[in-house]
């Protein structure tokens, strides 16, 4: 029986028209306005086992863990400190949010309840009341209630680290009663409900009891975790594997098919990752190299399924304290890059070139934007205009190959293209995310060019645009490692957040994309397809384009 996957097709990849303006949903299970539509009928067919088969299969599967090979381990288990996708692979075993993206049987994505049963929104879209579940406890026995939510949100905002970028300016978080919490915003924030799928709830008791020198438990929570989720952190051997075991008191219970343990196995070498999956030593593999997909699809017991994504591959350029501070030089580099060699050669044509900073599939995409294409003569003319007719300077290209198998070859293409402009480029690969992030946040010593994989975790363009390009998110708070700061661009982003109508917001985002294309803070190199690679014994895994690749572990079970 094939893995139970829901193949999500994104309408905007095929239609130029954008979604009709619709206000943010104010009740559970309302369909998302993402450009996501019903999967083809054949992709939805699944073979349902009989009850007897389920019991037998579940008992057999309980004898071994679900093994998921990942290219990188979490930076930290503290979701208020770092919530990039690799961190969330571990964090979402243990932690949950108030709201979640759900996938319906017909393949549509919507906002649904998790720790909040329902919510109410004021007419001015500034006040939200979340009604919480009454049957939830953290795994250390601490009650999950309104006080716990208040503490979590206030901690998240007080830390002022990158995950706080997901939440708008909050005027107050108030406890209405034990199981109702009121959040008052300083101004309307169009994607607020979608953004509430991101803050994960930590046990206040665990964090407070391990606080050191006012760090709100950060140090302890780096390697420890106490949440309301289906699993508890059992062990973590850095650089090797993270193991989580069932939370026996999990509020959804353990009837039906589930796994007792989950192992995140760190495998950075692409060939090794493929061999482990082929041998049946792993059940799911993340980020398999495209070179291996054709062979894997023919391997016995292996399933390869496409999941169209909003994932973009960007090469961002430092806009301060280097020759790249001149936008004409950045434009020249954007024209010099060989997009076709990268997309068709390295990515095996399993990607397309974006028009700009917003991916295909987003309702905010400016379909009239003209992308940069390779034009070496134009690139050389811009270099001469900027005062660098022969190049004559040196840059560092910073990569993290463990995050993307394609990065070494992508860097070599860019290095060669820069050489054509007389720019000497040195490639510097970082071994882990913490080191990588530390360097791009250093204004003086950071690399001139770095690779960044952007992923839409919610159905709203502000999520990535703000943290990558807004002036407020340079340095420690964000990932604006290009140090791009433009008052007009900031103003457009800020204004778009306060408008409920998508049609009105889109006009602002169209203007914004024109500015970014002209300023060229990044080379928008490719929008990749995504492929789910698993063993055919894996059941219950549902593909979701938001929070790309992070499973709902509770739903997973194994048929052997």
Where are these regions (language model features)?
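A structural "hinge/loop" feature
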Residues: 72-91, 115, 142, 192-202, ...
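Detector for C-terminal structural segments
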Residues: 13, 237-241, 246, 336-367, ...
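Ligand-site clamp/hinge motif
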Residues: 219, 249-295, 424
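Gly/Pro-rich hinge or "lid" segments in bacterial periplasmic/extracellular proteins
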Residues: 102-106, 199-254, 261, 269, ...
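Surface-exposed binding/hinge segments that line
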Residues: 131, 165-210, 235-237
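Aromatic- and charge-enriched surface segment that lines or borders ligand/interaction sites
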Residues: 117-162, 176, 182-184, 276-278, ...
């Amino acid at each position: 029986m094939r893995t139970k996957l829901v193949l999500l097709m994104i309408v905007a990849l095929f239609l130029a028209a954008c979604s009709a303006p619709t206000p943010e949903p104010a009740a559970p299970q309302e369909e998302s306005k993402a450009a996501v539509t019903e999967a083809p009928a054949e992709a939805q067919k699944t073979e349902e086992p009989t009850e007897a088969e389920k019991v037998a299969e579940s008992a057999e599967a309980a004898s071994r863990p679900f093994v998921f090979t990942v290219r990188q381990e979490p930076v930290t288990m503290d979701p208020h400190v770092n919530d990039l996708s690799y961190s969330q692979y571990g964090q979402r075993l243990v932690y949950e949010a108030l709201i979640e993206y759900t996938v319906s049987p017909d393949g549509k994505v919507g906002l649904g309840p998790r720790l909040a049963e329902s919510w109410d929104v004021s007419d001015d879209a500034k006040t939200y009341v979340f009604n919480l579940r009454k049957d939830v406890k953290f795994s250390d026995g601490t009650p999950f209630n309104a006080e716990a939510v208040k503490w979590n949100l206030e901690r998240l905002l007080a830390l002022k680290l990158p995950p706080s970028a997901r939440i708008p300016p909050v005027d107050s978080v108030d406890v209405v009663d034990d199981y109702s919490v009121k959040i008052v915003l300083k101004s309307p924030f169009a994607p607020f409900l979608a953004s509430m799928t991101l803050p994960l709830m930590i046990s206040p008791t665990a964090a407070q009891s391990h606080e050191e020198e006012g760090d709100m438990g950060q140090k302890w929570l780096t390697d420890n975790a106490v949440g309301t989720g289906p699993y508890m952190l059992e062990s973590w051997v850095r650089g090797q594997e993270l193991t989580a075991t069932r939370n026996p008191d999990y509020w959804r219970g353990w009837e039906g098919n589930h796994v007792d343990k989950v192992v995140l196995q760190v495998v950075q070498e692409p060939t090794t990752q493929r061999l482990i999956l082929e041998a049946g030593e792993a059940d799911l593999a993340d980020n398999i190299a495209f070179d291996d997909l054709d062979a894997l699809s023919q391997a016995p017991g292996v399933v390869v399924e496409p999941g169209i994504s909003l994932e973009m591959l960007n090469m961002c350029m430092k806009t301060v304290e280097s020759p790249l501070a001149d936008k004409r030089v950045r434009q020249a580099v954007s024209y010099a890059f060989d997009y076709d060699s990268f997309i068709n050669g390295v990515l095996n044509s399993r990607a397309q070139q974006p028009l700009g900073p917003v991916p295909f599939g987003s309702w905010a995409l400016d379909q009239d934007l003209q992308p940069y294409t390779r034009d070496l003569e134009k690139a050389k003319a811009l270099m001469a205009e900027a005062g660098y007719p022969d190049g004559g300077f040196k840059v560092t290209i910073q990569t993290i190959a463990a995050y993307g198998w394609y990065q070494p070859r992508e860097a070599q293409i860019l290095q060669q293209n820069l050489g054509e402009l007389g720019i000497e480029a040195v490639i510097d690969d970082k071994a882990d995310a913490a080191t990588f992030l530390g360097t791009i946040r250093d204004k003086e010593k950071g690399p001139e060019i770095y690779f960044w994989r952007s992923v839409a975790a919610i159905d709203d363009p502000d999520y990535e645009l703000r943290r990558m390009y807004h002036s407020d998110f340079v340095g420690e708070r964000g990932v604006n490692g290009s140090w791009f700061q433009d008052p007009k661009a900031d103003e457009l982003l800020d204004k778009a957040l306060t408008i409920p109508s998508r049609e009105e917001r889109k006009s602002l985002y169209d203007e914004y994309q024109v500015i970014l294309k002209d300023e060229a803070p990044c080379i928008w190199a490719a929008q990749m397809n995504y492929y789910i690679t698993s063993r055919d014994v894996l059941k219950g895994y549902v593909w979701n384009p938001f929070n790309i690749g992070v499973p709902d572990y509770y739903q997973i079970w194994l048929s052997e």
